[in-house]
Amino acid sequence: MDISTITSYIENLVNTPSPTGFTKLAEKYLIDEFEKLGYAPYQNNKGNVIVPINEMEGANGLLLSAHVDTLGLMVRSIKSNGALRVTTLGGFPLNFVEFENVKIYTRSGKEYTGVVRLNNPAVHGSDAPREAKRNDETMEVVIDAITHSKEETEKLGIRNGDFISLDPRFRIDNGFIKSRHLDDKASAGVLLALAKEIKEKNIKINRPLYMMFTIYEEVGHGASAGHPAGISDMVAVDMGVVHEDLTCDELKVSICAKDSSGPYNYDLTNDLVEIAEDLKLDYGLDIYPFYGSDASAAVASDYDYRHALVGCGVAASHGYERTHEKAIKSLFDLLVNLVKK
């Protein structure tokens, strides 16, 4: 498959706002795209999008998962100056979103743009830009509307609990894909491309195969319930960690041996390693010191699965992230061969 097909899916997903808890647009995008490919996606009560790729009798099914919820913000309170105090959706330091453009979604359906910044952001006014801690007391969202008071902001329809998405700033330069939310929309785009490849090339699959796109992974319970029946193996497709003492980088596919939840299934992880070596893929086998996946959430919720974790190497996780087309293509090739196995 041409890499541009995969990156187009990734770009479309990245540009579809879906902070965790506010993912309706991404859910609709997935459903529409899978229906175009001739599949019959459905949603469980939680809202995860589940796609039967190869339905057949048997209890040895394979479930591939990715998540489409992303980091974001929520209005904690409206300040006396009309700006917004915020709380984070997912785990990241607020300095990772300093000076980022945002969009605020009211519960009545209105949308406003704004920017995240320090309460006192002018370098010509104080030492705050150099010295201030970055937290929810020292930073705020200023709205692109004329408001100088809590009352004026309330008249806009903005209230506590409104969701806020971050501008992803997607771009590709010399093969490097740079954007927010590559965790995990890069993986979701790869799975969409995989489903397209299976359908268009009539790839023979010898076991039940499902895909699941979760919407609460960033807060820990994305794959905790509502799975299709007959699954024995689950592979979470999620970003690979790039760090100074790990083997993965932005050009590689990453296979995880252990994360914060403990080790992944030995045999299923070895299957991924064997495929990567047979294909002569550039890959890394690593532990992720601060990480949890949908697969680990599933086994912690008493699903009797062998579980594994694989993804493209993503640098600067939970910030302005970067991977490379080579890593995306390697991940795609690994998954094509996994479903044939």
Tell where the protein language model's regions lie, with residue ranges.
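N-terminal hydrophobic/helix-forming segments and targeting peptides
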Residues: 1-341
